[in-house]
């Protein structure tokens, strides 16, 4: 009797484990919109004048795990203002896609560039504060930024 119950429950247990195995990885996967926020948004701070800002932020935001990300830009504006860019001037992305948008106004940003002598795991970055219009790629529903494409001088 107990053996019969075990034989019935075993396939159900195996099925449950298989389903969890397929579902679980997608539960922990970071969406493109969340990755954009992690890698590029720092609205709580003004563009820091500290020369160590990029070194600290690149580590804190997990962009130096396994390699040194060569270039990254942090945006020091409210998230809603950056999300609004998705409904501003449509421009062609660097890769030729047509889902990029340029901000109507300049934004406070910090550019982080890997120094020439820097090697993993000792990633060292040069910090540059700028006021630039930014270009982001947008997708999804809701339509939100998923990629930082460029920053450009204000031409007005």
From Swiss-Prot:
Question: Listed GO cellular component terms?
Answer: extracellular region
Matching entries from PROSITE patterns are given as: RNASE_PANCREATIC
Superkingdom of this entry's organism? Eukaryota
Record's keyword terms, sorted: Disulfide bond, Endonuclease, Glycoprotein, Hydrolase, Lyase, Nuclease, Secreted, Signal
Task: Please give the biological process terms from Gene Ontology that the record holds.
Answer: defense response to Gram-positive bacterium
Listed EC numbers: 4.6.1.18
Catalysed reaction equations from the record: an [RNA] containing cytidine + H2O = an [RNA]-3'-cytidine-3'-phosphate + a 5'-hydroxy-ribonucleotide-3'-[RNA]; an [RNA] containing uridine + H2O = an [RNA]-3'-uridine-3'-phosphate + a 5'-hydroxy-ribonucleotide-3'-[RNA]
Q: What is its main location?
A: secreted
The protein's location, in the record's own words, is: Secreted
Recall the GO molecular function terms of this protein's record: lyase activity; nucleic acid binding; ribonuclease A activity
Glycans attached where?
62, 90, 104
Q: Which residues form the signal peptide?
A: 1-28
Q: Disulfide connectivity?
A: 54-112, 68-123, 86-138, 93-100
Q: Which Pfam families match?
A: RnaseA (PF00074)
Query: Transmembrane residues, as ranges?
Result: none
State where substrate binds: 35, 38, 69-73, 94, 113
Q: Which residues carry out catalysis?
A: 40, 147
**Family classification:** Belongs to the pancreatic ribonuclease family.
Subunit structure of this entry?
Monomer. Interacts with and forms tight 1:1 complexes with RNH1. Dimerization of two such complexes may occur. Interaction with RNH1 inhibits this protein.
Q: Its function?
A: Endonuclease that catalyzes the cleavage of RNA on the 3' side of pyrimidine nucleotides. Acts on single-stranded and double-stranded RNA.
Name this protein carries in UniProt: Ribonuclease pancreatic
Which organism does this sequence originate in? Lemur catta (Ring-tailed lemur)
């Amino acid at each position: 009797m107990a053996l019969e119950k075990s034989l019935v429950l075993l396939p159900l247990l195996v099925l449950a484990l298989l389903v969890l195995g397929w579902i679980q990885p997608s539960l922990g996967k970071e969406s493109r919109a969340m990755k954009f926020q992690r890698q590029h948004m720092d609205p709580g701070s003004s563009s820091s004048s500290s020369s160590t800002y990029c070194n600290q932020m690149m580590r804190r935001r997990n962009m130096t795990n396994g390699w040194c990300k060569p270039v990254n830009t942090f945006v020091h504006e409210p998230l809603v203002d950056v999300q609004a860019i998705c409904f501003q001037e449509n421009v062609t992305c660097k890769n030729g896609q047509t889902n990029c948008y340029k901000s109507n106004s300049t934004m406070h940003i910090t550019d982080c560039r890997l120094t020439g002598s820097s090697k993993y795991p000792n990633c060292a970055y040069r910090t540059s504060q700028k006021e630039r219009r930014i270009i982001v790629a947008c997708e999804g529903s809701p339509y939100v930024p998923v990629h930082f494409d460029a920053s450009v001088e204000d031409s007005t």
